[in-house]
Amino acid sequence: VTLRDYQEGFVSKVRELFASGRSAPLLVAATGSGKTVVFSYIARSAATIGRRVLILAHRDTLIKQASRKLTDYGVEHGVIMAGFTPQHHCRVQVASVQTIVRRLDKLPYRFDLVVIDEAHLSAAKSYLTIVAKLRESNPKLKILGVTGSPVRLDGKGLGSHAGGLFDDLVEGISIRDLIDQAYLVQPAVFAPAEQVDLSQVKKVGGDYDSGALAEVMDRPMITGSAIDAWRKHCPGVPAVAWCANVAHAQHVAAEFTAAGIPAVALSGDDDGAERERALAGLASGAIKIITFAMLLVEGVDQPAIGAVILLRPTMSLSSYLQVIGRGLRTIYAPGMPIATVEQRRAAILAGPKGAKCYVLDHAGLTFKHGFADDIREWSLDGVVKKKGKKKDPKEEGPAVAQCPKCYHVHPKAPVCPSCGHVYE
């Protein structure tokens, strides 16, 4: 296994913190940075010296993704989830949070290291219960959390001082850095001139109620605008569309299909094989659009996705960044060297995807949360701050401009970087 330079830095920093007496660091690294690669490497290293490792995830897609990566690394492991035969002899176990919380009293051994994937979820009672029980059998238990964003909708911090699990923060690598190093492509945002009015949409648990949101977003005018935008800015480019709920996703897929653009809606009711077929269809060109509500927010690695259509307003910065991340993965031209930044850039430009991902923002998320590649400061307190000079407190939202000619959304500048329009 060969780690990238920055991934080696993650591993070294985590080891340094454990050696210094920290027991529960949280690694924050952008979608596409290879967090699964890093924690699989750490798990393998721990198992090699006789430690028992538990990897926790909350979705079957994430569990299977971790299992595949461990298999790639030659790590014998068990999967603790409904439908899998227990492999108790394995030192590494990948587990569903929902399954293991029910089997805590039946575990035949203690663990030395717990890895928590999507660790921004770990403030939930189920995670805290699991860790407390595992610490009863091993007071020296170490924890490693990994996440792309430690900010939660409920405002809870993830630090132990705030009732969370973690005692230190490892700031990994940002989307901006990954783009600059040619490990991700650049998002190019376009949005309609008019933003949707959400003032009457009720919120539940800190975010918009999906049913009420669908009533606002699931309208022919909005869907038609998204279809027109895809045809104008990125015709033929494989895309995923994030929708308010499953019914909305089905309606959007039907509208794209009716417009002569092959589309399919995916939901949690679809089995894994159906998801894989749809994603493969996107890569082959048989399908142009996959619509979804929450299914593809996490755990999807399909580099062919070249456009992300945002049709779901959200208060969740974490979900927003994850969805944009679905389209930022690179496709390097086969056979070209990719050892240096310059080589990777050349291989991206020569590849079938190119150097950008189109973000068609019909949900106003860029105006709400800023650009996906903005540099953010993270905290275990749950507070997120944008780096850079302070803005006028009267100024609301990020420093975003929208070109009146091509509707490109970009950081404020005197000239539109897309069409060259000069702002007055």
Predicted features and spans:
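Conserved interdomain linker/interface between the two RecA-like ATPase lobes of SF2 helicase motors
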Residues: 167-243
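Conserved helicase ATPase core of P-loop NTP-dependent helicases/translocases
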Residues: 64, 78-89, 250-257, 261-297
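Post-DEXD/H (motif II) to motif III coupling segment of the RecA-like Helicase ATP-binding lobe
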Residues: 120-189
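Conserved pre-motif I regulatory segment
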Residues: 1-28
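Conserved helix/coil segment N-terminal to the catalytic DExD/H
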Residues: 82-113, 124-129
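Conserved RecA-like P-loop NTPase helicase motor core
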Residues: 96-101, 113, 268-376, 380-381
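Walker A/P-loop
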Residues: 20-43, 242, 266
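Conserved Walker A/P-loop ATP-binding site and its immediately adjacent core
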Residues: 36-38, 45-72, 246-247
